[in-house]
Amino acid sequence: YVILVYDIVTDDAGKKILPNVFKICKKYLTHIQHSVFEGNISTPKITALKNELKQFIRKDVDSVILFSSRDERWLKKEFIGLNDDKTSRFI
C-alpha cells in the first residue's frame, strides 16, 4: 500500500510537466486529493511508476514522496475539514 504526494513548481516548464506527472500517478494509483494518490501496488509496478516519474521530475525544484506500508489497514485515515472520502475510480 502506497501514499504518493508530489510538489511540482508551476513555472513555465512545470506547467507542462504537471499534467504528465498527474497522468502517470493516476495510471497506477487512486487520486484522492490535489497532488495526493493512494493504492495497493506491487513492487514491480512501484518500480515502473518511479521510472516513469523520473523522466519528468526536475531534481532541483520538484519532489515526489512515497509512503509505503505493508497494508492499508495499518494506517488510520482521519479528515479535518471536508470529509470527501470518494476516490476518483468511482463514477
Positions of PLM-derived features:
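Basic nucleic-acid-binding interfaces
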Residues: 1-3, 8-91
